[in-house]
Amino acid sequence: GRTSPYAFQGLRDEGVEILIDIGKKYNIPVVTELTSIEQVKKYGNKLDIIQIGTRNMYNYELLKEVGKLKTPVILKRGLSATYNEWLLAAEYIKNEGNNNIILCERGIRGFDPTTRNILDIAAVPYIKKNTSYPIIVDPSHATGTRYMIRPLSIASIAAGADGIMVEAHIRPEKSLSDARQTIN
């Protein structure tokens, strides 16, 4: 993943522009992560959904900037964020006028290195009971392990998740990022 500065970092702005072009050409919705205020200003109104990744959940200036738009936002939970911290991060977006927020449980940091993270399935019913936000689950990042994606997807839907987000590639083993947790 992008935790290492030596890992593939994605195509950045060029990649966002490619996605926008593909979305227009094939009339498909485009969701991608934006990591800077500059990117939000440049691409925020051109995307169907903006994703705020786990490392930026605490980037309050970035959250305020996406809050100024009407574009829906997927807000991923921080690696060690409590439910309250996650919901307060959503408030930064909401307080700027954007109520189109989708929360994404993507696993929290644990001590056992067997899986990349630990899927907090309890987050789903908690968010459903205590907020009006839709919640989706990312079992790919929660485990970092391909064979766990299907059973955790089923568990997430059973717990009440509004959707699932998974890493996919036509040839997962060739994926430049997150190959171990990518399905075909």
Q: Predicted segment positions?
A:
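Active-site beta-loop-alpha junctions enriched in small/polar residues
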Residues: 1, 35-37, 55, 78-80, ...
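Glycine-rich, proline-tolerant flexible connector loops at the mouths of alpha/beta enzymes
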Residues: 1-14, 169-182
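Catalytic beta/alpha-barrel core
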Residues: 28-36, 48-61, 71-83, 102-106, ...
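Catalytic cores of alpha/beta
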Residues: 38-46, 83-89, 144-161
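Glycine-enriched alpha-helix->loop->beta-strand junction motifs that scaffold or abut catalytic
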Residues: 42-51, 67-73, 94-100, 131-134, ...
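Conserved, mostly hydrophobic/aromatic
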Residues: 43, 75, 127, 138, ...
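Glycine-rich phosphate-binding active-site loops on the catalytic face of alpha/beta enzymes
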Residues: 54-58, 156-181
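Active-site/ligand-binding-proximal alpha/beta "capping" segment
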Residues: 94-155
